[in-house]
Amino acid sequence: MIPAAFDYVAPSTVDEAVQAL
């Protein structure tokens, strides 16, 4: 998927997911 799509859906959630990694 396009990163922009994730940022549009929920940047906070994505950021947390990245930290989880």
From Swiss-Prot:
UniProt entry keywords in alphabetical sequence: Oxidoreductase
Q: Which N-terminal stretch is annotated as signal sequence?
A: none
- Keyword ATP-binding belongs to the record: no
- Which Enzyme Commission number(s) are on file for it? 1.2.99.-
Coiled coil: which residue ranges? none
Oligomeric and partner information: Heterotrimer composed of an alpha, a beta and a gamma chain.
User: What protein is this chain from?
Assistant: Formate ester dehydrogenase beta chain
Q: Which Gene3D superfamilies match?
A: Uridine Diphospho-n-acetylenolpyruvylglucosamine Reductase, domain 2
Q: What InterPro entries does UniProt report for this protein, alphabetically?
A: FAD-bd_PCMH_sub1
State any single GO MF term: oxidoreductase activity
Q: Does the keyword Chaperone apply?
A: no
